[in-house]
């Protein structure tokens, strides 16, 4: 499959479109044919070497979020079916024609939401959720004052 990789860190000029092996899902994983991905700050930091690839591959496939169509499901996956439209987040490897992720890392794309729009949702919304609910302890019925809602996270 084709993927955008970096073999050295730097600006956009280090991005290379190349052939890499197709990923193979494990029993609890899904294989998604990526229709769209998004570019966010973490991607640019990873490209520059300031946000290392946690999987430590010989080449880094960038991209933290995706939207696409389910192509294969692992043997123990019951929540998804081939053909489902999903969006999700992964620790890299989304700038590729296919991505493998744990079944819990994917969300269904609501009817009426285009794949291109869905690709820009996971990273920023999960970042906002983590900040407000996980880190900040926000619960139902409580309020939070957000002084600045800038960048992609501000859209959430």
Place the predicted regions along the sequence by residue:
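Exposed loop/turn and edge beta-strand positions of beta-sandwich/beta-sheet ligand-binding modules
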Residues: 16, 28, 64, 103, ...
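Glycine-rich beta-strand-centered segment in the early N-terminal region that forms part
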Residues: 21-38, 50-93
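Cytochrome P450 core scaffold surrounding the K-helix E-X-X-R motif
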Residues: 41-48
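NAD(P)H dinucleotide-binding glycine-rich loop of Rossmann-like/cofactor-binding domains
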Residues: 45, 79, 85-149
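NAD(P)H-binding Rossmann-fold N-terminus in SDR/SDR-like oxidoreductases
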Residues: 152
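Residues forming the Rossmann-fold NAD(P)(H) cofactor-binding site
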Residues: 155
């Amino acid at each position: 499959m084709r993927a955008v990789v970096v073999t050295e860190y730097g600006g956009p000029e280090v991005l290379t479109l190349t052939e890499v092996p197709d990923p193979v899902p494990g029993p609890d994983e899904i294989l998604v044919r990526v229709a769209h991905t998004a570019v966010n700050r973490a991607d640019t930091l990873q490209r520059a070497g300031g946000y290392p690839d946690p999987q430590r591959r010989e080449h880094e496939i960038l991209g933290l979020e995706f939207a696409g169509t389910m192509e294969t499901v692992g043997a123990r996956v019951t929540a998804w079916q081939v053909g489902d439209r999903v969006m999700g987040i992964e620790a890299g490897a989304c700038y590729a024609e296919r991505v493998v992720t744990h079944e819990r890392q994917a969300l269904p794309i609501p009817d009426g939401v285009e794949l291109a729009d869905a690709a820009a949702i996971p990273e920023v919304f999960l970042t906002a959720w983590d900040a407000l609910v996980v880190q900040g302890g926000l619960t139902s019925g409580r309020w939070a004052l957000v002084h600045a809602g800038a960048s992609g996270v501000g859209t959430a």
